[in-house]
């Protein structure tokens, strides 16, 4: 593998070093874009190891920032495509890695740029900005662009993604993600492992695509959003807003669930309900 250039210029484990480069480039970390730098080397290594990069695999990195993870990834992959929205960080990334044959930088918003890129890739990696994490995951699912992903997100969101049926964190987003991925927690990360320290804990997740038998994704997504909009209500009081033919309420496939709240219905059961409802449309 090709080794990264100028890696000695930034000590990614040192707040002093990071502050220095930010000062030199007149950069102020932006909370909006999740610009918090993971300064714990052992955690960075553990996260990258969980990606389990095989020879010749192509990787996308969303939001590389100063390039701490990029530096490690480039030693493991034949092609890394990095999406960076901040032009000042893009300049730093170009200086550090721009001459490497296995590095490609895309400047701009990932959600706007990725549709135009070659999607023949194997895995996606990101320390996702907390305010857009659910949006990015939802968008990739809606577009049926399902790749193995290792993502660091706000712990609260990770708890929702990995929630079990009958738990307080079980939500429409849980059902959406778990119907398309197997979600595995890799590590919880405390605030002090970042600079600047965020106000919330983080969790790294591994999302592994899995097959499902959803017949109509749009109807499935609409169903779970509708019933979870009244999560404390029983299904009979919320699904009425989704179905057109009220006679369906008498069908056996649905009757057994009408007395349950959405948090008591499993992912597979939601898929079955959606498919059966779809047969009536």
Swiss-Prot record:
Catalytic activities: adenosine(1518)/adenosine(1519) in 16S rRNA + 4 S-adenosyl-L-methionine = N(6)-dimethyladenosine(1518)/N(6)-dimethyladenosine(1519) in 16S rRNA + 4 S-adenosyl-L-homocysteine + 4 H(+)
Pfam families: RrnaAD
E.C. no: 2.1.1.182
Keywords: Cytoplasm, Methyltransferase, RNA-binding, rRNA processing, S-adenosyl-L-methionine, Transferase
Enzyme type, top EC level: transferase
Record-listed S-adenosyl-L-methionine binding positions: 36, 38, 63, 84, 109, 127
MF term (GO), any: RNA binding
A cellular-component GO term for this protein: cytosol
Compartments, record wording: Cytoplasm
NCBIfam families tied to this protein: ksgA
Function description: Specifically dimethylates two adjacent adenosines (A1518 and A1519) in the loop of a conserved hairpin near the 3'-end of 16S rRNA in the 30S particle. May play a critical role in biogenesis of 30S subunits.
HAMAP family: 16SrRNA_methyltr_A (MF_00607)
Family: Belongs to the class I-like SAM-binding methyltransferase superfamily. rRNA adenine N(6)-methyltransferase family. RsmA subfamily.
Protein's UniProt name: Ribosomal RNA small subunit methyltransferase A
Gene source species: Borrelia garinii subsp. bavariensis (strain ATCC BAA-2496 / DSM 23469 / PBi)
């Amino acid at each position: 593998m090709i080794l990264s250039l100028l890696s000695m210029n930034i000590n990614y484990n040192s707040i002093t070093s990071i502050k220095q480069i930010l000062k030199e480039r007149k950069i102020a970390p932006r909370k909006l874009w999740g610009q918090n730098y993971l300064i714990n080397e052992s955690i960075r290594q553990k996260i990258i190891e969980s990606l389990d990069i095989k020879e010749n695999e192509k990787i996308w990195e969303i939001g590389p920032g100063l390039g701490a993870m990029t530096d490690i990834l480039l030693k493991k992959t034949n092609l890394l495509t990095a999406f960076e929205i901040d032009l000042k960080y893009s300049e730093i990334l170009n200086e550090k890695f721009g001459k490497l044959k296995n590095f490609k930088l895309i400047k701009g918003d990932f959600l706007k740029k990725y549709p135009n890129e070659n999607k023949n890739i194997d895995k996606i990696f990101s320390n996702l900005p907390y305010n857009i994490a659910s949006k990015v995951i939802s968008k990739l699912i809606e577009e049926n662009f399902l790749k193995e992903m290792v993502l660091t997100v706000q712990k609260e969101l990770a708890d929702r993604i990995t929630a079990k049926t009958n738990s307080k964190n079980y939500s429409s987003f849980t059902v959406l993600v778990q119907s398309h991925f197997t979600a595995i927690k890799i590590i919880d990360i405390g605030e002090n492992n970042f600079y600047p320290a965020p106000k919330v804990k983080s969790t790294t997740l591994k999302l592994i695509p899995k097959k499902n038998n959803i017949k109509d994704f749009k109807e499935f997504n609409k169903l779970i959003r509708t019933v979870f909009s009244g999560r404390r209500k029983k299904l009979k009081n919320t699904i009425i807003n989704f179905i057109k033919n009220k006679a369906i309420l008498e069908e056996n496939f649905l009757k057994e669930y009408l007395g349950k709240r959405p948090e008591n219905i499993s992912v597979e059961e939601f898929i079955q309900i959606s498919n059966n409802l779809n047969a009536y449309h």
